[in-house]
């Protein structure tokens, strides 16, 4: 599976930051670790304001764990491959159910359904304790942000949507 990165673009564009969290690719969501690459001036600006956005500094355990995660390239590769495979499977299944979405290489699918409003789907999913994001904002108010979970989580989502959409045509 092909993986792409925008890292090479930071040499070309001095206003570009490439940001990566450890949440999915390194299975460390609770530790709130991430990094940014880009123009040194932009990185300095980030350092100047970082406590305004995240007042929780990383303790020694978090730092050691983060370094170990970066060094474990095999786990990172395996996790990314699983996320990509699950995402591609879910996109195929969602498309078969009538969803559309932009082509993306992210860890989420920004989907809309041709005949069922996103808000209705969102509320039905929430009743089943299946959580996706819904933003009641102009231009995106008929879209769901579906984070790529485990294969089992995505199967649960798809199975529910199959039943729900069958009954709501």
Question: What is the role of each PLM region?
Answer:
Residues 1-7, 26:
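Conserved PLP phosphate-binding loop immediately N-terminal to the Schiff-base lysine helix
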Residues 3-4, 19, 115-119:
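Structural motif corresponding to alpha-helix initiation and N-cap regions
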Residues 8-16:
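Nucleotide-activated donor-binding/catalytic signature segment of Leloir-type glycosyltransferases, i.e.
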Residues 37, 110-112, 147-149:
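Short hydrophobic/aromatic beta-strand micro-patches
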Residues 83-84, 93-128, 144:
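Conserved PLP-binding catalytic core of the aspartate aminotransferase-like
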Residues 124-128, 133, 137-169:
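PLP-dependent enzyme catalytic core of the Aspartate aminotransferase-like
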């Amino acid at each position: 599976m092909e993986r792409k990165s925008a890292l090479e673009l930071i040499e070309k564009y001095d206003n570009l930051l490439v940001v990566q969290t450890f949440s999915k690719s390194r299975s460390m969501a609770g530790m709130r670790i991430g990094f940014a690459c880009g123009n040194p001036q932009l990185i300095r600006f980030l350092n100047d304001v970082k406590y305004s956005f995240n007042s929780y500094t990383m303790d020694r355990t978090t730092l050691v764990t983060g370094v170990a995660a970066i060094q474990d390239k095999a786990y990172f590769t395996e996790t990314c491959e699983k996320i990509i495979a699950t995402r591609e499977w879910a996109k195929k299944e969602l498309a078969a159910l009538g969803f559309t979405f932009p082509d993306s290489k992210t860890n989420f699918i920004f989907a809309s359904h041709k005949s069922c409003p996103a808000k209705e789907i969102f509320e039905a999913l929430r009743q089943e304790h299946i959580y996706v994001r819904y933003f009641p904002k102009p231009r995106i108010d008929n879209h769901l942000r579906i984070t790529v979970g485990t294969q089992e989580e995505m199967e649960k989502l798809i199975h529910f949507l199959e039943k729900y959409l069958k009954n709501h045509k």
